[in-house]
Amino acid sequence: MSVQSTIRRKTAPDIRARKGGDPIVMLTSYHAHTASLVDRYCDAILVGDSLGNVMHGFETTVPVTLEMMILQGHAVMRGSQHALVVVDMPFGSYEASKEQAFHSAARILKETHCGAVKLEGGVRMAETIAFLTERGIPVMGHIGLTPQSINTLGSFRAQGREEGSWEPIEADARAVADAGAFSVVVEAVAEPLGRKITEMISIPTIGIGASAACDGQVLVLEDMLGLSPKPPKFVKRYGDLGPGIEAAIKGYAEEVRSRAFPGPEHVYGMKSKA
């Protein structure tokens, strides 16, 4: 006999239904503990392949593996109860064919129990998105600046800022929506373009360096907490935890070296005889 939880987790259809409504709040998380904190205030949690930068110190997200994403996705699911958890599909796990994408996405859903996957690309990935959604896998799209394409782009630069550069990005947005994605991340595009895309398509847009007019926003948690040395322009720091963490580590090191720690209150005495 199983005991059913009374806690209801948000789903992809819940997020889809927020189009044009209250803004969708989303942050990244890679650990159970931070997920439990983010879960209290956010509608969705993204287990982003940015974990390659944040956790592993990679310069790009390209080296991230499917196994890394599954491991951290499972941790975030264990730490959260309410938010929709979306796990990134890493570079090399979905581009070769629709079938490869399905097998990778199915592994993510089966092994993490998350509610959706996210993949990068617009027109070029539309058939893949449709293939997944038709087989019961909720997909969040990602257009504009696509970090997994860094070796093609050459640098992490905002998109759609030049005259005549909007059309391909608009086409990507339409393709993702028409393919059945329940929402789409719009990253680092000119603000008027982010606004136009939001008005143009029928699914929620989740902005990151796009526009306040988007249906929601997402940031990397460590960026907004002040733990990243050089965050992108679009990041607002809501905390400055770096100096506080450094001060705590410094204080610990000093007390260990001076033998001030552990103190009497931190050690165990002998039990008295009855």
UniProtKB/Swiss-Prot annotation:
Example of a GO MF term: 3-methyl-2-oxobutanoate hydroxymethyltransferase activity
UniProt GO BP: pantothenate biosynthetic process
Gene3D superfamilies on file: Phosphoenolpyruvate-binding domains (3.20.20.60)
Subcellular localization, as worded in the UniProt entry: Cytoplasm
Enzyme Commission identifier(s): 2.1.2.11
Entries under Pfam families matching the protein: Pantoate_transf
Biochemical pathway: Cofactor biosynthesis; (R)-pantothenate biosynthesis; (R)-pantoate from 3-methyl-2-oxobutanoate: step 1/2
Cofactor: Mg(2+)
Cofactor binding, per record: Binds 1 Mg(2+) ion per subunit.
Highest taxon of source: Bacteria
Residues holding 3-methyl-2-oxobutanoate: D49, S50, D88, K118
Binding site for Mg(2+): D49, D88, E120
Active-site residue list: E187 (proton acceptor)
InterPro entries referenced in this protein's UniProt entry, alphabetically: Pantoate_hydroxy_MeTrfase (IPR003700), Pyrv/PenolPyrv_kinase-like_dom (IPR015813), Pyrv_kinase-like_dom_sf (IPR040442)
CDD domains on file: KPHMT-like
Functional summary from the UniProt entry: Catalyzes the reversible reaction in which hydroxymethyl group from 5,10-methylenetetrahydrofolate is transferred onto alpha-ketoisovalerate to form ketopantoate.
Subunit structure: Homodecamer; pentamer of dimers.
Similarity remark: Belongs to the PanB family.
NCBIfam families noted in UniProt: panB, PRK00311.1
Name under which the protein is recorded: 3-methyl-2-oxobutanoate hydroxymethyltransferase
Organism encoding this protein: Rhodopseudomonas palustris (strain ATCC BAA-98 / CGA009)
Gene coding for it: panB
